[in-house]
């Protein structure tokens, strides 16, 4: 299982946002929607061995299980609509216990530290100052952690430094978060860029 933990610093934690202004009034939710699409979708299909954790404002987490998800399409508006439903179901979540809003989509009241404690597998921080991804052997069941359009806060960076097994960059140029996810998938799909 591949897991991606994406921190959404400005993302809404309530369902009170318009679907027609994801980059503005929805706090750059468009970035997170693109991350979900990059993590889950392939041409004409979906990866069923992926989980995505969207940590919103360090207080709410939406977990998407690609093996169980239904009704999701790769466009931002569709993904945002399902995230809106998840945030609406937040009242049913009890602490770290998840509530389901639709098949494969779960919401809980937990922040970054609790998510790091819950994931299993080697934690890989995706960061522009890390070692080259190509220099790291592909890992079994990795947990990739990355931030949205903002840098990790000092507190997040400290938690991640303690929890991570590797800190890597995906290339010499800083990429958007969703593009970094695509490169990470390619690294694993090709056994470290060796098998095509």
From Swiss-Prot:
SUPFAM superfamilies registered for this protein in UniProt: alpha/beta knot (SSF75217)
EC identifiers of the protein: 2.1.1.257
Keywords from the UniProt entry: Cytoplasm, Methyltransferase, S-adenosyl-L-methionine, Transferase, tRNA processing
Any one Gene Ontology molecular-function term assigned to this protein's record: S-adenosylmethionine-dependent methyltransferase activity
Cellular location(s): Cytoplasm
Catalytic reactions of this protein: pseudouridine(54) in tRNA + S-adenosyl-L-methionine = N(1)-methylpseudouridine(54) in tRNA + S-adenosyl-L-homocysteine + H(+)
Residues given in the record as S-adenosyl-L-methionine binding sites: 126
GO aspect biological process, one term: tRNA methylation
InterPro entries referenced in this protein's UniProt entry, alphabetically: Alpha/beta_knot_MTases (IPR029028), TrmY (IPR007158), tRNA_m1G_MTases_N (IPR029026)
Top EC class of this enzyme: transferase
Recorded GO CC terms: cytoplasm
Function per UniProt: Specifically catalyzes the N1-methylation of pseudouridine at position 54 (Psi54) in tRNAs.
Database matches in PANTHER family: TRNA (PSEUDOURIDINE(54)-N(1))-METHYLTRANSFERASE
Record-stated family: Belongs to the methyltransferase superfamily. TrmY family.
Assembly and interaction partners: Homodimer.
HAMAP family assigned: tRNA_methyltr_TrmY (MF_00587)
Protein name, UniProt field: tRNA (pseudouridine(54)-N(1))-methyltransferase
């Amino acid at each position: 299982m591949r897991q991606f933990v994406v921190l959404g610093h400005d993302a809404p934690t309530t369902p009170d946002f318009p679907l027609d202004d994801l980059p503005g009034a929805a706090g750059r939710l468009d970035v997170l929607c693109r991350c979900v699409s990059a993590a889950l979708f392939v041409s004409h299909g979906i990866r069923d061995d992926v989980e995505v954790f969207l940590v919103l404002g360090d207080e709410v987490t939406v977990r998407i299980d690609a093996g169980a998800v239904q009704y999701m399409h790769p466009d931002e508006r569709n993904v945002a609509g399902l995230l809106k439903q998840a945030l609406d179901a937040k009242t049913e979540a009890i602490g770290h216990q998840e509530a389901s809003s639709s098949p494969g989509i779960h919401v809980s009241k937990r922040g970054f530290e609790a998510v790091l404690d819950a994931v299993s597998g080697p934690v890989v921080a995706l960061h522009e100052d890390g070692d080259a991804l190509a220099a790291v052997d592909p890992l079994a069941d990795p947990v990739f952690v990355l931030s949205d359009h903002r840098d990790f806060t000092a507190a997040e960076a400290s938690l991640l430094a303690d929890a991570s097994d590797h800190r890597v960059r995906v290339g010499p140029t800083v990429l958007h978060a969703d593009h970094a996810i695509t490169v990470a998938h390619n690294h694993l799909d090709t056994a470290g860029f060796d098998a095509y």
